[in-house]
Design a protein with these regions (language model features):
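Residue-level detection of beta-strand-connecting loop/turn positions
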Residues: 22-23, 52, 209, 221
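Ubiquitin-like/PB1-type beta-grasp interaction modules and other compact soluble beta-rich domains
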Residues: 58-266
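Surface-exposed, flexible coil segments in extracellular/virion-facing regions
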Residues: 18-35
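A short beta-strand segment in extracellular, disulfide-stabilized domains
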Residues: 1-12
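Extracellular and select intracellular beta-sandwich modules with Ser/Thr-enriched
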Residues: 28, 53-59
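Exposed beta-strand face motif in extracellular beta-rich ectodomains
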Residues: 40-44
Length: 266
């Protein structure tokens, strides 16, 4: 039996013969794998029983906290006891589905809010866009059309398509309202800046929870729009951008191992 002081997931992987006496098997070992969503130290008491009695021993496990955690965030918006995470994954190369690591720019912000109040994903997004002058969001109502970021922190962003030319002056509190006709093929003119969205890629919304960034398998594609998504303590709202090909339309998943903290405001 196992007594665990802190929550761990236990998976029995296999049974293996380990000890024989006079060519007879006298015991087998069960092999277990222990996993945890959170880092920390864990005490496990193991008890073995046979016809001669029983004995116990204690194991101490330490789960390494190498995964990106909420405590790693640098750029915070809001006040309150609860925390949520907002993150965007840009891809600079042509292959959105299978980018090289160096083509991925994936950053996260923190959002604090009062547990006695109710906030949605759009509330968090707008608050962070207002607070961080490097973040730019194009939307149509509450539909997110695209995300931009001032990569070299020069206080400027410039986006251009065949029909539209935007600068930082066109954004109010980090937001710009686009029509369905004027957002096609926007590109940043400064190679150090980031932009993805418009009509060649659609924003894709993923949800997760926990003190650390969820694994790719633990992120769930959101079944609700951002204005209907109610925040929970330790919730994660992550945006990727997926190619519009009008055939497979496969959503691009987050790549958690590449996430890092958005820099704090100057």
């Amino acid at each position: 039996s196992n007594y665990i002081h802190r929550p761990l997931r236990i998976h029995e992987e296999e049974m293996r013969e380990t000890r024989c006496l006079n060519k007879k098997t006298v015991s087998t070992d069960s092999i277990y794998r222990f996993t945890s969503q959170d880092p920390g130290s864990f005490e496990i008491i193991l008890t073995a029983t046979n016809q001669d009695g029983k004995d116990s021993d204690t194991l101490f496990l330490k789960v390494n906290g190498n995964r990106f955690a909420i405590s790693d965030l640098k750029n915070w918006t809001g006040n309150g006891e609860n925390t949520s995470v907002f993150a965007i994954q840009w891809v600079t190369g042509e292959h959105l589905q299978e980018p090289a690591d160096q083509e991925v720019f994936f950053i996260a912000w923190g959002y604090r809010w009062n547990k006695t109040e109710t906030f949605t994903g759009i509330d968090m997004l707008k608050a962070i866009a207002k607070n961080d002058p490097r973040l730019y969001v194009a939307l149509s109502g509450n539909y997110i059309k695209g995300f931009g970021y001032d990569g070299n922190n020069d206080g400027k962003i410039e986006l251009k398509s065949s029909t539209l030319h935007l600068t930082q002056a066109d954004f109010t509190n980090g937001l710009y309202e686009l029509s369905e006709y004027d957002s096609d093929e926007l590109k940043p003119l400064d190679a150090a800046d980031y932009w993805m969205g418009s009509n060649d890629a659609y924003t894709t919304y993923w949800l997760g929870s926990g003190n650390q960034v969820p694994t790719a398998a633990d992120f769930e594609y959101s079944q609700t729009f951002v204005d209907n998504r109610q925040l929970e303590n330790l919730s994660w709202d992550v945006w990727t951008l997926s190619p519009i090909d009008y055939t497979s339309m496969v959503n691009v998943s987050p790549i958690p191992r590449l996430i890092k903290a958005a820099e704090a405001n100057k």
